[in-house]
């Protein structure tokens, strides 16, 4: 601080506080010199009429008067207050206007005229009014110049404010003027003016002390008008000094003023100076000092503007050559160094001397044994110096660098704070390697790093912190070995909590020390395997963990390079996981799988890691395999099970993707057995993961992707929809209805109830109703009993409600254990043939041949609840078969590849076997799907027994008058047992629903099935019951063009039903094509084939006309043409045929006249020759009937 105020009496904090609070008792205790400074305010207080009329103030006022009575200077102040201030203000305003007109020139003053002597002598000889005018004139002149200079600082020499004899009288006048003329002399403007004169800080403190309420206003004004960098200019330094004096007078507001400094980003030196003043008065030995906190907050805070502003202050301060002890920056650095040295007691460390180089001097002293109470403060100091050097550009002196290195290499106690301190020290060494400049310092650093390696296990076990600095050492060593310097820089910045610029070249010496002296790659690898896994690893555990080190070592293939097994460590870590999922786990699994399948180098193709064994995987799932999924205390968490499931699925996928690469290896990695996969409850685990999506991060979506690729039968849309119903609001309501009785039924009781089904249905129904209230996982123990007893539910007399309940329970179980459930169900529904032992199918059998599902008991075909289950399994196994064959094709891709000896001269043909195998696979899948569809369509046909009962007319979709409809039974039929809700109709609907899904999924299936053909009796059912049948319009032209007459007939019959169901422009064009084809075939077919073709297809022409009346003329012409051809082929019966041909011509020409005749019953049953067995004659009669039907339809307007 400048020596300008030296020797002057300033207002003490005690006196200022007394003035603020108007504490008369404390004011009375002041000494005469202290009281003299406050007289202007006290005299005004005593003389002016108060706003406070209370009795207490009256007493205080008496005390003030008594206090003032003995002071001689009071009389002069009273005389000053007696002046006419209104006239004075008017003269001052006139002088301001005059100066403004004259352009600020120093013309004649209205306030002060005819000065005979110097300003000081005039002041001495003048009375009170003139003294007021002298000071006011001088003050206004300075204020005017301040406003004219636009912020540029200047220094004004003024006798009035410099003469030590009259300072107190001038201060009295100044205070009275400001108090009486506040509008003319705003206190902030007066403060700005006082900065420009000598002793301005003293005058300013007196002025504020006499107006204590203006303290914050004055400080804020001075800061706001201040310079961005105060130590760079005289004005900045004077402003800083003045504000420091003010804050010394009112120390309680010093930190608030410092906040104003930061807020405005002005006067950084003042902020530091106030902090230094506060640190000296509020010094705390053990805790982090206010200086460290303040500077750290500026440089490490989120406000970039503040960070840049303070960084500029540090850089500018260093550029000045004269950084003397008077500099605020120098004082700050000195204080920080003192604090740093204060926590480093000098201790002779015999251990280090013993380990050190023999050439070291025996008198070396090392700072060691950092006290526990100093650790947090040491960490804060390290981060501060990192910020000063890395962000603000501070260049440490030799003394600072030496002390910093001693602090960094000190040894803290084994506490969490000690672990943090060591991590910070290590990163600071990496970030600022220039701190190590001499061989002795380098040796000290190496010894400290060696101590870190030896002590990290002890620190971790004692401190209880999972993220020890040992992992960071390993990680940095691995980064150095793989030359990932940018990763080291990111690690350093992350640990220090600041973004600093580190040149990769500065790490070269540290890299040499790490890779050659401390951590060779083999040492790193061997050490990493011995590092304990992190217990209950989750995202809540931050910092650098063993998993980070293992991940980097796996990426660099260090384990395989040095033949170190890492499988057990990874397995243990996966078992020790919990939610929320740590983000490094999935990348760890991915890189581990890659290290299993991909050799470390071409020269050593067998250098790979070992996969997790099947037994280890089974141990992890043993709790849920046996149905104990609801066990209260689980040995392994659901997170561990999901991670291992992710590992298995990813491993299998990668194995298939790298088949060609792995073929060249002598020791190929093996796929996990199907028996292992059958025992893992995949769907149950996926469902558990669905409820933990937020905590599992991306694991749930990754599992779904793998599931859709490798297990499409577990991703059926219907299952997801069903699962939503099971886990929705209804499930919550059912849980509310769950009674204790529902929980008491055991699987054994359910088996006993099933055994009693032939006699009584009540008990099994009651137990199953209770089971519907259980959750899916709670139902798992009952699965075997439910499936094994399905066969006896096929017996007659079993209520429909029992069957529906079994279906409902099966669907619930299907959400958690579909694959096991399907195998048990297929085996349970096998036909019960005496003397023949039933075969027990496995999961593999059913994936190879999905049609096994349909080789069930025939009674299932007329039991809709169980047929629904069967169709569900069939759909799943068809999808599973596709995935199985695709995987099998990839696994055996190398078997058909020709050997190099056989491929000479066959360049370009090496891929032929692959293409052939793919085609064979597609052909097999198409045959499999079409066979399933044909079997299902066959099931839709009524049996002989059902036909005998006349069920066909009532229970199937029929064609009435050429219109495909669903028949509506009479009331009598509804009351009968065979109605629209009969079993056959329900089974037909279920099958049509599945066929619709299959056709939509793969339209080629529909094409293949219709090219194969099926009974025409089913066409009304399939066209009306399968919404996707319209896709047949795309390939009917191709089907009609087939040479087989049966396919052409089937195509026209199919088209006739499609035209009625879908009367679209496309249908019209295909129908027109069909009519043209029929006309063409008429000219080429023989008599026998003509009869075989036109007899079944002529009714289709009626449907064409009904759907598309524009085809009427073409169809009528075709019919006449067919009749004429038939007549010409029967020369011996021309006499009999001529009348028919004549009638056909008349019907075509006058259809309205014949419509009435056709309705005559005698015509329908009349004299036509229907006894002839000649095919042409029968065809002519059929043509006549077709024409008449078309005419009736057109006349009636249908």
Curated annotation (Swiss-Prot):
Membrane topology: Single-pass membrane protein
Compartment list: Nucleus; Nucleus membrane; Cytoplasm
Presence of the UniProt keyword Kinase in the record: no
The keyword Translocase is assigned to this record: no
Domain of life: Eukaryota
A GO CC term attached to the entry: cytoplasm
InterPro entries attached to this UniProt entry: Int2_metazoa, INTS2
Alphabetically ordered keywords of this record: Cytoplasm, Membrane, Nucleus, Transmembrane, Transmembrane helix
Transmembrane segments: 421-437
GO biological process annotation, one example: RNA polymerase II transcription initiation surveillance
Record's subunit section: Component of the Integrator complex, composed of core subunits INTS1, INTS2, INTS3, INTS4, INTS5, INTS6, INTS7, INTS8, INTS9/RC74, INTS10, INTS11/CPSF3L, INTS12, INTS13, INTS14 and INTS15. The core complex associates with protein phosphatase 2A subunits PPP2CA and PPP2R1A, to form the Integrator-PP2A (INTAC) complex.
Family: Belongs to the Integrator subunit 2 family.
Protein purpose: Component of the integrator complex, a multiprotein complex that terminates RNA polymerase II (Pol II) transcription in the promoter-proximal region of genes.
Name of the protein described by the UniProt record: Integrator complex subunit 2
Species of the source: Mus musculus (Mouse)
């Amino acid at each position: 601080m400048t020596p300008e105020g030296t020797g002057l009496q300033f207002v003490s904090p005690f006196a200022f506080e007394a003035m603020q609070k108007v504490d008369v008792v404390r004011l009375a205790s002041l000494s005469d010199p202290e009281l003299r400074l406050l007289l202007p305010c006290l005299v005004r207080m005593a003389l002016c009429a108060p706003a406070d009329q209370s009795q207490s103030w009256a007493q205080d006022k008496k005390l003030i008067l008594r206090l003032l009575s003995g002071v001689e200077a009071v009389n002069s102040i009273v005389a000053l207050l007696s002046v006419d201030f209104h006239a004075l203000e008017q003269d001052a305003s006139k002088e301001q206007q005059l100066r403004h007109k004259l352009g600020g020139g120093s013309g004649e003053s209205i306030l002060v005229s005819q000065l005979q002597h110097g300003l000081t002598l005039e002041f001495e000889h003048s009375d009170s009014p003139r003294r007021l005018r002298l000071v006011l004139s001088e003050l206004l002149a300075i204020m005017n110049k301040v406003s004219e200079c636009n912020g540029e600082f200047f220094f004004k020499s003024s006798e009035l404010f410099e003469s030590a004899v009259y300072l107190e009288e001038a201060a009295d006048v100044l205070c009275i003027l400001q108090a009486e003329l506040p509008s003319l002399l705003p206190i902030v403007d007066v403060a700005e003016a006082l900065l420009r004169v000598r002793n301005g800080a003293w005058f300013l403190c007196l002025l504020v002390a006499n107006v204590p309420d203006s303290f914050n206003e004055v400080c804020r004004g001075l800061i706001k008008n201040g310079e961005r960098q105060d130590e760079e200019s005289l004005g900045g330094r004077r402003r800083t000094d003045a504000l420091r004096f003010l804050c010394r007078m009112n120390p309680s507001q010093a930190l608030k003023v410092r906040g104003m400094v930061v807020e405005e980003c002005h006067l950084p030196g003042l902020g530091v100076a106030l902090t230094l003043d506060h640190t000296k008065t509020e010094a705390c030995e053990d805790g982090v000092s206010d200086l460290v906190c303040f500077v750290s907050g500026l440089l490490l805070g989120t406000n970039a503007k503040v960070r840049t502003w303070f960084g500029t202050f540090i850089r500018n301060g260093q550029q000045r050559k004269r950084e003397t002890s008077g500099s605020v920056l120098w004082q700050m650095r000195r204080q920080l160094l003192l604090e740093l040295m204060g926590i480093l007691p000098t201790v002779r460390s015999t251990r280090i001397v013993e380990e050190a180089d023999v050439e070291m001097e025996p008198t070396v002293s090392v700072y060691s044994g950092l006290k526990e109470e100093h650790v947090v403060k040491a960490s804060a100091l390290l981060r501060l110096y990192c910020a000063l050097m890395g962000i603000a550009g501070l260049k440490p002196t030799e003394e600072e660098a030496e002390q910093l290195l001693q602090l960094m290499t000190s040894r803290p106690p084994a506490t969490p704070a000690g672990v943090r301190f060591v991590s910070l020290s290590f990163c600071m060494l990496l970030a600022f390697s220039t701190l190590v400049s001499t061989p002795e310092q380098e040796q000290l650093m190496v010894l400290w790093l060696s101590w870190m390696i030896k002590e990290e296990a002890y620190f971790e076990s004692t401190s209880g912190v999972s993220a020890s600095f040992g992992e960071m050492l390993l990680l940095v060593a691995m980064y150095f070995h793989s030359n990932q310097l940018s990763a080291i820089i990111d690690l350093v910045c992350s640990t220090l909590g600041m973004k600093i610029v580190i040149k990769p070249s500065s790490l070269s010496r540290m890299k040499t020390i790490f890779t050659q002296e401390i951590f060779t790659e083999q040492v790193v690898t061997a050490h990493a395997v011995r590092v304990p896994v992190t217990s209950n690893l989750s995202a809540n555990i931050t910092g650098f963990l063993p998993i980070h080190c293992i991940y980097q070592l796996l990426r660099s293939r260090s384990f395989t390079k040095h033949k170190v097994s890492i499988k057990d460590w990874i397995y243990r870590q996966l078992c020790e996981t919990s939610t929320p999922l740590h983000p490094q786990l999935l990348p760890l699994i991915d890189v581990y799988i890659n290290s299993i399948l991909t050799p470390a180098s071409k020269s050593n193709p067998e250098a790979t890691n070992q996969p997790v064994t099947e037994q280890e995987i089974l141990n992890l799932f043993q709790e849920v395999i046996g149905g104990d999924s609801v066990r209260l205390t689980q040995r392994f968490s659901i997170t561990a099970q999901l991670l291992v499931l992710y590992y298995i699925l990813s491993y299998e996928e990668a194995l298939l993707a790298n088949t060609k690469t792995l073929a060249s290896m002598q020791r190929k990695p093996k796929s996990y057995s199907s028996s292992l996969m059958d025992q893992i409850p995949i769907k149950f685990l996926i469902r558990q993961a669905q409820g933990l999506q937020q905590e599992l991060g991306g694991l749930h979506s990754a599992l779904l992707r793998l599931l859709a690729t490798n297990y499409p039968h577990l991703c059926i849309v219907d299952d997801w929809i069903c699962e939503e119903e099971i886990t929705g609001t209804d499930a919550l309501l059912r849980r509310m209805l769950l009674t204790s009785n529902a929980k008491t039924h055991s699987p054994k009781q359910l088996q006993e109830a099933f055994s009693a089904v032939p006699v009584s249905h009540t008990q099994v129904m009651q137990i199953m109703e209770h089971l519907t209230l259980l959750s899916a996982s709670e139902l798992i123990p009952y699965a075997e009993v439910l499936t094994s007893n399905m066969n006896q539910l096929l017996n007659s007399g079993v209520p429909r409600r029992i069957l529906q309940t079994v279906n409902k329970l099966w669907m619930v179980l299907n959400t958690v254990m579909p694959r096991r459930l399907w195998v048990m169900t297929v085996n349970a529904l096998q036909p019960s043939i005496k003397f023949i032992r039933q075969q027990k199918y496995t999961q593999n059998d059913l994936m190879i041949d999905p049609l096994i599902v349909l080789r069930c008991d025939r009674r299932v075909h007329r039991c809709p609840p169980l047929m629904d289950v069967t169709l569900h399994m069939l759909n799943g196994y068809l999808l599973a078969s596709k995935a199985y064959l695709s995987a099998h094709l990839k696994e055996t891709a190398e078997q058909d590849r020709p050997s190099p000896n056989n491929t000479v001269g066959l360049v370009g043909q090496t891929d032929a076997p692959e293409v052939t195998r793919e085609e064979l696979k597609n052909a097999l899948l198409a045959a499999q799907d079409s066979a399933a569809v044909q079997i299902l369509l066959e099931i839709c046909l009524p049996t002989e027994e059902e036909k005998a009962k006349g069920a066909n007319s009532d229970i199937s979709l029929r064609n009435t008058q050429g219109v495909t409809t669903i028949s509506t039974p009479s009331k009598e039929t509804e009351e009968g047992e065979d109605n629209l809700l009969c079993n056959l109709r329900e089974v037909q609907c279920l099958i049509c629903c599945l066929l619709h899904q299959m056709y939509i999924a793969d339209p080629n299936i529909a094409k293949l099935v219709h090219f194969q053909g099926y009974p025409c009796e089913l066409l009304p059912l399939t066209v009306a019951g399968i919404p996707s049948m319209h896709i047949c319009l795309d390939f009917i032209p191709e089907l009609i063009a087939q040479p087989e007459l049966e396919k052409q007939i089937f195509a026209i019959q199919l088209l006739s039903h499609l035209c009625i169901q879908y009367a679209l422009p496309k249908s019209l064009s295909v129908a027109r094509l069909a009519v043209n084809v029929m006309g063409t075939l008429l000219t080429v077919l023989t008599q026998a084939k003509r009869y075989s073709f036109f007899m079944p297809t002529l009714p289709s022409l009626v449907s064409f006309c009904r759907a598309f009346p524009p085809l009427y003329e073409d169809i009528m012409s075709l019919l006449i043409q067919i009749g004429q051809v038939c007549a010409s082929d029967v020369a011996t019966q021309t006499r009999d045929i001529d009348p028919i041909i004549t009638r056909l011509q008349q019907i075509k020409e006058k259809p309205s006249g014949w419509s009435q005749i056709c309705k005559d019953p005698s015509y329908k049953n009349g004299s036509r020759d229907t006894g002839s067995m000649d095919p042409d004659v029968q065809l002519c009669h059929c043509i006549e009937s077709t024409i008449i039907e078309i005419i009736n339809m057109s006349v009636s307007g249908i």
